[in-house]
């Protein structure tokens, strides 16, 4: 059975055809690709990865590297570091990121809400843009829910 992305998931990291999962209190490797995990989780929540990509693109106007909604009720939104077709693409759960910054080695450091840190060899501006897109998507979803109650 594929890994179920949940509120304790911090990040999904590629290891060839396997995936390293970072969770709140443990890290482990699963024998499945990131794309298969994400696709399965999208299907469990009533869509497909392509459907989620189109939905995100429509809501925030970003067609390249859009954030992906995994579970709208639990506010699980994935942030990709690259195109999902790139084998080096890492995925982060927006709600579990406390902060991120550029260190003295010019690497992006992501600090999660459990104080765990992950250093990435990425452009800070690109990562910042991805986080902002995901935040915009979350805000759009929240606004849509709020309008239902008015």
Summary of predicted features, one role per range:
Residues 1-92, 96-150:
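Eukaryotic intrinsically disordered, low-complexity regulatory linkers and tails enriched in Ser/Thr/Pro
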């Amino acid at each position: 059975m594929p890994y179920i992305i949940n509120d304790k998931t911090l990040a999904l990291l590629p290891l060839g055809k396997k995936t390293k999962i970072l969770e709140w209190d443990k890290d482990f490797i699963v024998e499945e690709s990131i794309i298969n995990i994400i696709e399965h989780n999208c299907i469990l929540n009533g869509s497909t990865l392509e459907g989620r990509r189109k939905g995100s693109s429509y809501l925030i106007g970003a067609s390249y590297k859009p954030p992906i909604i995994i579970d709208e009720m639990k506010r699980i939104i994935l942030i990709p570091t690259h195109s999902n077709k790139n084998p080096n693409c890492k995925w982060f759960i927006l709600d579990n990121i406390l902060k991120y910054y550029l260190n003295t080695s010019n690497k992006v450091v992501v600090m999660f809400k459990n104080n765990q840190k992950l250093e990435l060899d990425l452009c800070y501006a690109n990562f910042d843009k991805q986080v902002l897109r995901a935040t915009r998507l979350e805000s759009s979803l929240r606004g849509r829910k709020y309008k239902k109650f008015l």
